[in-house]
């Protein structure tokens, strides 16, 4: 039967489209969609339940209620198909047409569409150049608008209220024309000549210089040109005909109680029809104007609430005071059409159950309950039963399954073999949250999960549930097996490290078996091979941890060598463990206590050296072995395992004495309360650390005599210590709370309580201590809940901005790249250069520092062997390709991306790197903190370091340094960005330090230094002013008690001058600026080198001068010191909020002020509360900026600054960095800042992922000069469009476009994407759709999201080939048929038009 119908069905070509075009629907188009006019507000007859004729559910308009049966029942059956019944007028056809046939309502008066009126910026308002308020007054019948002033002094589009209108009519009669309501607006829009208007705007643009005016004009210009180009007519923003949704999409369902459940839309439509009909009647009766006007206004309001309830005026509510859901509400938000039905659907063939551990499974297996499998694989079972002739029909097969016949279980066994299923655990934060396994049928009702897969799913067995999905088609099964099988996902896509790593019990077991124990049974025995060791161990002759000698196969570190037997000194456990090592892996990897890190390194090495298969087998074996020996170890935990250190009491007594001393000083008035607080906190946090250190020493080390009678130390076998040391569970910080002291606690406002909790959990807390600690515990729980939601939202925004970044080609051919060097924090190399460039492609060759030859050519993929060469070459910076500089237009190329982290080879075409990047950054989001850090105590003391002490031997290298030599012959730094690096003998950078202005260096550039040597010193508490030339000091504007204050130093008794702040000076001295000038022996001012400008040192408020007028000054002397306020420490935003701020490109509260041009600094006249800083460049350009007085400036009069240098401290704004220092610096800044946040939490993310997001944030450019293109100067455009246009212009020898990149936050960038479908499904649906339809946008369906929404394969992975094939076929067709036929296919699909030809806008 079905096949018959399918044959008759006309084949729908609507499926075959390549673009979607959205535009405004003209009244004629709306009528053409309609199957009839809805004239009555009635819905269905309450007795017969049949729809009323001409009503909202009318069968004549919308189609029959039952398949192939007219309403009155005259025609039934398929044979009458297509007949229109002459009694009831219903066409005999399928009832499903009631889901697609639309109706319409002819409105008695035009009505404005609220989206184009109220959605900001108001499109109608922009076109007419009126404010929204003015238009509303016209539309809602408060004012008249002058349409044609005629010969009167009235102006066009002037608004007149009732009285003014009457007055004008009395004065001028019918000379002028004024109207009100939507008719007036429609009339104006209809008679608008867009070409002339555009001409006018161009003329106005050339005439005006006002910024705001230009902005407004540009907006109007853009709107008008796009209206003109897209073929949308402005008057279509006013509705004459209202389309009616098909009735099955707004159903009316009778309930048992005789009441009806109805969609809100029906109520809204009824109001429109009622008011429309009433208005028609009033117009026929020629009712008084005021009544008609009121009715028209009510009709306008009814249509408004139907389209978007609540956007204007009161929200229309239903019977239960709940706002009615209008058409706009249907599509927006989480419950709207986009996010609820199009992007996420519920799927068939799925089930869910609790998970339990499956320690006997292999990595690619999962245990599936039989009952569940039976339900999931039903269709396959039916097929098997029928083909093997157990059953003749589907019905019979169904019966067999219901009766549980034995054949059914055989069938299940057969169909499940080699058929992978997919397991998913919510929340799916990254792609490893869904993996494929081969099912093993089990009894019971819980799914068994392999323990090693837990880390990827973030699953534990405390009641977690997982869902099972069955891939049905052959292709789906194939992809599940090759791409999603858990054994194919060993490495994490975020950082390329193994994610299949033993944890907890397994680690403990492996650690226990590889430890050494002195004096163990059988120590010193020798064995021929491992088998002999095994026999000896099983017979109880040797202990697991005994040190023995045994012959083992030996391989080189890199896996070469024959595996010759070598006598090795090791332990029994390690020898046994060596049995599971794959052939070719060196024994040295396990010849140590196997802590978690060591196990991870072993798996990583195995993967890199021997490949996937060996690694999977090794991981499984490690798991079985780990569980076995964890059981044998009998590790348990008891109160006696928590050893409280003996020294604790003594340490506490010492600290209490120190605190008493500080209290005493405070009481004597030597300390302020803030200083006291900081010092006390400092003491206690130090005490906590000391106790913890002593505790770990006592807990972790045991002294005993060995066989030779010597006293030796060995690690203890204390259970608690072993668990923490191996990395199985717990950390030093937690043990510290168990057996050390709990330490300092925070108050609810975040400040730290001065009295710490000195007890630990083993000793027990008293009531007060317990009460203090409750706050922290509760805050932790509240934080976690908030964090999850915030982290999820961040991931959603990231995915949305990067969803269409796909690898589309192999090589884009660019020669550009970014510079990468090691990451250094506080002098230590935190991330080595090798780690940062692993898996990248070189953009410039690497030159060997020792020989000067090319060590690695450009275009090399840096894998492990190449990294070894790189390290030998002794370079400390490398240029590599990056997605930031990739020249591919749509997507990125494989060479710029580099290695696919999850597979370990160059990335393949079709990989959705954007989504992977978003997931890698978003997934650890829940581990980040939510709160801002308060720096107190320990952190503060660390901040006041005043010297550089070297940790390694090497050669000192200075970079970015300006120095002068002082009278002692030492170098003094006079630059702010100076750095000191220590280079080792191989030419590698080992340490890097920033040197502040005024640091005194004890060494010269290139000098050899020894470990522990102090290279530079400075005073961390003051900021010096250093003389760069010599001369006699001469004071200007130094007036005691007016501009300066004299006091004597308490220690030395010398006179000290302090510059007074403006607020402390008398009014007469407000403009005086104290400065020190240097004079030569003739008494003339000394000028700075190469210029005529005298050297003046202006002194800011608070500066302290230790000189006298007329003192001799040498180069490098300190003229004055500016005290640093170290007490005022701001909180650093950390964790998630910081990451969100960076990705949203938010401007910091007090951004650093950067130099806009290169030149010389001078100070202009001060204004109230602000100082004026002027930079004069060499070519005569001048840049002025007003800076608040309280901002501390980094520069002095006469200093040279480079463009982009920091003038006043603060967090630099990313927009400034991009503008002044360029894209590379910006990328470096964002990557560095985000990595800092994640590194604090110990999360590793590859830089590439952050770069992908940055690339998306830089998608837009600002047009500076449009050249001979259709762009407008000052507008923002997509970079790819601009590049395309420039190619075209250059080919025609026309002027190209000049532009500069702009940075957009991720939310803004998602909404500004080329694809309106993707943007609408993200946020602000109404605004996006309104804008898109006015501009007549075309969605090319390039991204992933758009294709999911229209129900296609995504253009990534295996879907990329499908899309490229389609494109090629289409190009061929177009080539063969010419473009004549392609226009016929253009078919309007609602307002969303699916077009097959290239749009005119391309």
UniProtKB/Swiss-Prot annotation:
Enzyme Commission (EC) number: 2.7.7.6
Disulfide bond sites: none
Class of enzymatic activity (EC top level): transferase
GO CC, one annotated term: DNA-directed RNA polymerase complex
Region annotated Disordered, chain positions: 1373-1402
Required co-factors: Mg(2+); Zn(2+)
GO MF assignments: DNA binding; DNA-directed RNA polymerase activity; magnesium ion binding; zinc ion binding
SUPFAM superfamilies hit by this protein: beta and beta-prime subunits of DNA dependent RNA-polymerase
Chain positions recorded as Zn(2+) 1 binding sites: 70, 72, 85, 88
Co-factor note (free text): Binds 1 Mg(2+) ion per subunit.
Keyword flag Protein transport: no
Chain positions recorded as Mg(2+) binding sites: 460, 462, 464
Reaction catalysis annotation: RNA(n) + a ribonucleoside 5'-triphosphate = RNA(n+1) + diphosphate
Gene Ontology terms: biological process: DNA-templated transcription
Annotated Zn(2+) 2 binding sites: 812, 886, 893, 896
Task performed by this protein: DNA-dependent RNA polymerase catalyzes the transcription of DNA into RNA using the four ribonucleoside triphosphates as substrates.
PANTHER family for this protein: DNA-DIRECTED RNA POLYMERASE, DNA-DIRECTED RNA POLYMERASE SUBUNIT BETA
Known partners and oligomeric status: The RNAP catalytic core consists of 2 alpha, 1 beta, 1 beta' and 1 omega subunit. When a sigma factor is associated with the core the holoenzyme is formed, which can initiate transcription.
NCBIfam families documented for this protein: rpoC_TIGR
Family: Belongs to the RNA polymerase beta' chain family.
Name of the featured protein: DNA-directed RNA polymerase subunit beta'
Gene: rpoC
